[in-house]
Amino acid sequence: MKKTFCFILILVCIVLKSVNAEEEDNFEESSLEMETARCASKNERCGNALYGTKGPGCCNGKCICRTVPRKGVNSCRCM
């Protein structure tokens, strides 16, 4: 009985430690993004998840996207 209790206690400690380590990694990544995050000015390229484009959001205005006819790709700019 005592061995089973110790075994369960050790497993719980390992699980809690791994969950805590993942949270710390996520915190470091999000703080890095905050430092490097910037917004796009008027007429600069921007990102729009609906169109599958990556990039910063717009400082002012909206991210307007259009499909380039011959290439079939989306191009987004701040307006």
From Swiss-Prot:
Signal sequence region: 1-21
Propeptide: 22-38
GO-annotated molecular function: calcium channel regulator activity; toxin activity
GO cellular component: extracellular region; host cell presynaptic membrane
Keywords annotated in UniProt: Calcium channel impairing toxin, Disulfide bond, Ion channel impairing toxin, Knottin, Neurotoxin, Presynaptic neurotoxin, Secreted, Signal, Toxin, Voltage-gated calcium channel impairing toxin
Subcellular compartments: Secreted
Distribution of this protein across tissues and organs: Expressed by the venom duct.
Disulfide bonds: C39-C59, C46-C63, C58-C78, C65-C76
Role summary: Insect-specific toxin that probably acts as an inhibitor of presynaptic insect calcium channels, presumably Cav2 subtype. In vivo, induces immediate paralysis on insects, followed by death when high doses are injected.
Further information: Negative results: does not affect frog neuromuscular junctions and glutamatergic and GABAergic transmission in rat brains.
Comment text on domains: Adopts an inhibitor cystine knot (ICK) fold. Is defined as a knottin (one disulfide bond crosses the macrocycle formed by two other disulfide bonds). The presence of a 'disulfide through disulfide knot' structurally defines this protein as a knottin.
Listed name of the protein: Omega-phylotoxin-To1a
Species of origin: Tibellus oblongus
Classification of source organism: Eukaryota, Metazoa, Ecdysozoa, Arthropoda, Chelicerata
